[in-house]
């Protein structure tokens, strides 16, 4: 009897040990899978994983710049060169160019919307400057432009010097005002400025003669020129456009830059520029 009891006791002990080991192994496997999953997400970048979890890339674009980012009044859709460019980034991250959410921005609102996380990136005629690089990651440039001047044909202006003492309409928080102030100082002339919240407002001010000139990057002006206005030949302060993202979203910035450079190398960027008639 004692021998039987001893055998049963030993058997139970072995079962308990086996169960314990099995449980421990299962937990270890589960923990290993968990760790592996976390390591994978970490390797990819938490910022990219966050976009994948949302299932959509949120992008700030212009809605008042024909050819770049413009809300089509007939369809209600936002379309343009920078919209198409952003779709390629969505495709790279999410595998589908349509997994994109577009948010209209202006020169004044694009920074704050990026700062508070309402959008993941900005593709909105955003000029790269050393000062802005302190606040945001910028991709390599995808387009180079310069400040142009749109005036009424009947005004007779042919150069910036002709606008001495006149009022220039510019967008709020843009680099245009500073560029023209520096050029005016170089030429020994004086300019006055009136700032507006959107480009259509500046064009309306030009048409109603509240300003004498509409100044912004020349490629943007191309979308506003009409039979009664003309863009002067001179260009000031050559500047480059880049896609901006938050400084701590380093993996996103890396992916954005890869797409931009791949498109430049393959010729796709030039095809997009040609498609939208950007000069």
Identify the residue ranges that each predicted region occupies:
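Extended ligand-binding regions for polar small-molecule ligands
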Residues: 22, 32, 39-41, 83-85, ...
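Periplasmic-binding protein-like
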Residues: 63, 143-151, 218-261, 279
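Extracytoplasmic small-molecule ligand-binding "clamshell" domains
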Residues: 32-34, 38-45, 49-122
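Short loop->beta-strand "edge-of-pocket" segments that line small-molecule binding or catalytic clefts
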Residues: 57-61, 79, 161-176
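Ligand-binding cleft/hinge of the Venus flytrap
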Residues: 74-75, 87-98, 176-195, 278
């Amino acid at each position: 009897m004692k021998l039987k009891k001893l055998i049963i006791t030993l058997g139970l002990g072995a079962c308990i040990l086996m169960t314990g080991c099995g449980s421990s192994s299962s937990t270890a496997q589960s923990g290993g899978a968990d760790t592996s999953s976390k390591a994978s997400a970490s390797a990819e970048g938490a910022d990219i994983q966050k976009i994948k979890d949302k299932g959509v890339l949120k992008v700030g674009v212009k809605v008042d710049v024909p050819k770049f980012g413009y809300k089509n009044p007939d369809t209600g859709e936002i379309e343009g060169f920078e919209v198409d460019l952003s779709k390629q980034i969505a495709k790279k991250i999410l595998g589908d160019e349509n997994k994109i959410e577009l948010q209209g921005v202006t020169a004044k609102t694009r920074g704050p919307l990026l700062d508070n996380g309402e959008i993941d990136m900005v593709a909105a005629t955003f000029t790269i400057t050393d000062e802005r690089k302190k606040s945001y990651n910028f991709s390599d440039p995808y387009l180079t432009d310069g400040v142009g001047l749109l005036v009424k044909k009947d005004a007779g202006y042919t150069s910036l010097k002709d606008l001495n003492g006149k009022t220039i309409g510019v967008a709020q928080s843009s680099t245009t005002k500073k560029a023209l102030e520096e050029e005016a100082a170089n030429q020994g002339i004086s300019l006055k400025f009136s700032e507006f919240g959107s480009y259509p407002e500046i064009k309306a001010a030009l048409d109603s003669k509240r300003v004498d000139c509409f100044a912004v990057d020349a490629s943007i002006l191309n979308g506003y020129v009409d039979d009664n206005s003309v863009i002067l030949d001179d260009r000031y302060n050559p500047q480059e456009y880049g896609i901006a993202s938050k400084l701590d979203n380093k993996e996103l910035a890396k992916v954005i830059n890869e797409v931009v450079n791949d498109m430049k190398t393959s010729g796709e960027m030039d095809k997009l520029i040609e498609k939208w008639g950007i000069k």
